Amino acid sequence: MIRLATQQDVLPIAQVHVQSWRESYKNIIKQEILDKLSVEQRTALWRSVLEQENRRVFVYEENAQVLGFAAFNFPVDAPISELRALYLLQNIKGRGIGRDLVQLGLGLSREKSYQHMQCSVLNLNSSRYFYEKTGAYFVSEGDASD
């Protein structure tokens, strides 16, 4: 089930965030960086994100357990919304959940009259092919600090 995240979800969102980074970015990001990821720091991050009026975070859960999430930004001063995060645990990928989360964000984006939605993906991240299947297209290249 997909639903809007609440403050009670910050810990499971942070746990999925850290685990998903470790699963997805192995061999893309240095292992020492992945080893330093902290659920506590991510919990603080997601608590802050959920307090922001222009952000929406949706979680995917099964049996009352959060297994994935997507975060969207709807800036008040720009015509483009953003997919800021989409993370699913490895064992649920390929079931259409990511697509459903993206479609939910695109629908909200249209409702709010945004012209486009953007997201950033590391070049070596194979999920860029997932985004292309959802209709995304390459705009520009930058480094991880962009």
Where are these regions (language model features)?
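Conserved catalytic-core motifs of GNAT/GCN5-like acyltransferases
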Residues: 118-122, 135-146
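Amphipathic alpha-helical recognition patches that constitute DNA-binding helices
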Residues: 12, 82, 96, 126
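Active-site acidic-Proline motif in GNAT/NAT acetyltransferases
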Residues: 89-95, 123-124
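Acetyl-CoA-dependent GNAT
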Residues: 4-8, 15-91, 102-104, 108, ...
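Residues forming the Rossmann-fold NAD(P)(H) cofactor-binding site
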Residues: 99
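Short coil/turn segments at alpha/beta junctions that flank glycine-rich nucleotide-binding fingerprints
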Residues: 95, 112-115
